[in-house]
């Protein structure tokens, strides 16, 4: 079976994805499910749920079909924009053999939370864990600020 990679195919896929997400958000189904999955990951890894919600908000805008192709050619997928290629050992551990599996909200939040947890263990604080989640480049402090601003918003709503 040939791989569909034409521009028209990607545009159609994004359009269908947008319609599906819009329907889920309108019905309240999507966000309720995300809240439950975030609560589960928060309890499992000891990550404040506001941090997980903030990362999801900044990374994907709560779109479980979010996709991003990076400058290095790797791809981020799903709610937490998990990068398959940069996390091969975790992919193996979770039995993920196809990057498309990362569109599953439960699996994506589980793996994303695990990455964030490992970063926290490595650096000992949430600010550096968040920075490392996006990459340790010196120029990604804007990302950290965006996430922390969202954390404040979510704290007010909980």
Segments and roles (model prediction):
Residues 1-4, 11:
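N-terminal, intrinsically disordered low-complexity tails/presequences enriched in Lys/Ser/Pro
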Residues 8, 16-158:
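Catalytic glycan-binding domains that act on GlcNAc-containing polysaccharides
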